[in-house]
Regions:
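A short SAM/SAH-binding and catalytic strip from SAM-dependent methyltransferases
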Residues: 153-168
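Conserved beta-strand signature within the Rossmann-like core of class I S-adenosyl-L-methionine
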Residues: 182-190
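Conserved class I S-adenosyl-L-methionine
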Residues: 81-92
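Class I S-adenosyl-L-methionine
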Residues: 211-259
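Conserved alpha-helix/loop element of class I SAM-dependent methyltransferases that forms part
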Residues: 60-82
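A short glycine-rich, Lys/Arg-flanked "PGG" loop and its adjoining helix->strand segment in the class I
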Residues: 170-181
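Class I SAM-dependent methyltransferase SAM/SAH-binding core
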Residues: 87, 95-144
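N-terminal auxiliary segments of SAM/dcSAM-dependent transferases
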Residues: 1-37
Length: 259
């Protein structure tokens, strides 16, 4: 039976912390530890803690939602969903990979920037991925890029990892360009990041990509990603589309976006 951890959230009304700075307290024999939600290197080292916080307490639904819209989008074509070769960018400890495997996907390649994510996947979900790379996609060597490309992935997924500095824009575009033309691209993003008033580089990049010739959008849906620590719903967009071509650097230059 999975060990239950003693965790405590800040008292309601006392915390005005932004979503990317939210934190909790972990109670243990050595006392109380304050851990930020985005301190994944710490969270992954403690078996079951990630699942208990984000799925049991905060009711995260994103892996199932994103997998669902990917599957429904692919079914609009004559492609067999189970034959997709999927690159899971920001794979973490394998929650999204596990959801895809449940739906019959046979080929999964994981990527994350922190070794703790890989270690947690091997510990908790051994054998889930055909390969798992600990790599920074903003600094990917030609040799490593060729190795990852050799898997001939025709789909990229990324869940709950965009827009808060977890996966930089350049890394997202690098992964987009690695998958094959006519491949599938599925991700989720906080709803406010699609507001036209958000002028941050990441938001502008995603908006420009969605409405560009490089991606055909098949499905976009606003849904409840999870609850905040105050119990309020946090809404995201889930987006699924099909890649038409690699995105060249000059595309972003022409839009005044630095990646």
């Amino acid at each position: 039976m999975q060990k239950r951890h003693r965790i405590q959230f800040p008292k309601p009304g006392l915390s005005t912390t932004p979503q990317d700075e939210a934190y909790f307290y972990l109670q243990g024999s050595g006392g109380q530890r304050k851990i930020r939600f985005h301190d994944y290197d710490e969270i992954y080292q403690i078996q079951g803690l990630y699942e208990q916080i984000f799925y049991d307490r905060l009711k995260c639904s994103s892996p199932s939602k994103v997998a669902s819209i990917l599957e429904s989008s692919v079914k609009q074509t004559d492609i067999n969903f189970s034959e997709l070769r999927i690159l899971d960018l920001g794979a973490g400890n394998g929650m999204m990979g596990e959801e895809l495997k449940k739906r019959g996907v046979s080929r999964l390649i994981g990527v994350d920037i922190i070794p703790e994510a890989y270690d947690a996947t091997v510990r908790d979900r051994p054998g889930l991925y055909d390969a798992y790379y600990v790599e920074d996609f903003t600094k990917l060597s030609a040799e490593k890029k060729e190795e990852i490309s050799s898997w001939q992935c025709d789909c990229m997924v990324t869940v709950a990892a965009l827009g808060f500095g977890d996966i930089p824009t350049r890394a997202f575009i690098e992964a987009f360009n690695i998958i094959k033309e006519q491949g599938w691209v599925t991700f989720n993003i906080k709803d406010t990041f699609l507001n036209i008033g958000d002028e941050t580089g990441f938001s502008k990049t995603i908006r420009e990509l969605i409405f560009s010739k490089y991606l055909d959008v098949y499905h976009i849906e606003r849904y409840r990603h999870r609850l905040s620590i105050e119990g309020e719903p946090l809404y995201y967009f889930a987006i699924a589309g099909r890649k038409n071509a690699d995105v060249p650097p000059e595309f972003f230059d022409s839009k005044g976006i630095r990646i």
